[in-house]
Amino acid sequence: MSIAHSIRAQIPPIHPEGYPFIGGFAFASLILFWLWAPLGWIGVVLTIWCALFFRDPVRTTPVREGLVIAPADGRVSMVTPVVPPAELGLGDQPLMRISIFMSVFNCHVNRSPVAGRIERIAYRPGKFINAELDKASEDNERNSLVISTPAGRIGVVQIAGLVARRIVSFVREGESLAAGQRFGLIRFGSRLDVFLPEGGKPLVSVGQTAVAGETVLADFQIGDGGRVYRTD
């Protein structure tokens, strides 16, 4: 294997959603170089950051019925029972919610936490307050999915944040998803909430780092001898 090939293998691909932004930063950098070289170098740094933001690395997803996988890179910010948003149609009783906060330095491609069929997609406009705040789940712009699985209906909510102003969805109602499959992204910092049906046992705690498509958030088969899984 050549050195060049080894280097390329370590550089994650860029998601196509990022091309216009990276191109814009690069063009602005050229103009800044023309105006004053130090400003141009600042533009180069911002262009590199933008490319890193839209990186889309390959992930190895644990596969077994009953596992719930992290839908986003970031930090687990909340693990607590709350009443899910009304648009999910999951009832008015508290369900276990696991929240992952994504900073502007995290990869922002979102992946399905489970394998199943998309039963519902609901978009709701809203504000852009700090996504780390609990009230962001009620006040902020969000896009919600309900995924039907053998373990029950899983709610996944993309929440825009203080900097994030655009939620992008790649899927439609009725489509089937594989665990770890890409289903959307949020531009420039945000939060993902996962609502578990009864019986899901969280395996993460607040402050833990989550890796989209790899970290196991919860398991519906704890106590059933079903902890063995494979990776695809």
Curated annotation (Swiss-Prot):
InterPro entries: PS_Dcarbxylase, PSD-A. Its cofactor is pyruvate. One of its GO terms (molecular function) is phosphatidylserine decarboxylase activity. Its main location: membrane. The record marks 189-190 as: Cleavage (non-hydrolytic). It catalyses: a 1,2-diacyl-sn-glycero-3-phospho-L-serine + H(+) = a 1,2-diacyl-sn-glycero-3-phosphoethanolamine + CO2. Binds 1 pyruvoyl group covalently per subunit. The modification Pyruvic acid (Ser) is found at residue 190. It is an enzyme of class 4 (lyase). It comes from the Bacteria. The active site is at 190 (schiff-base intermediate with substrate). It holds the Pfam family PS_Dcarbxylase. Keywords: Cell membrane, Decarboxylase, Lipid biosynthesis, Lipid metabolism, Lyase, Membrane, Phospholipid biosynthesis, Phospholipid metabolism, Pyruvate, Zymogen. Its EC number is 4.1.1.65. Heterodimer of a large membrane-associated beta subunit and a small pyruvoyl-containing alpha subunit. This is Phosphatidylserine decarboxylase proenzyme. The lineage of its organism: Bacteria, Pseudomonadati, Pseudomonadota, Alphaproteobacteria, Hyphomicrobiales.
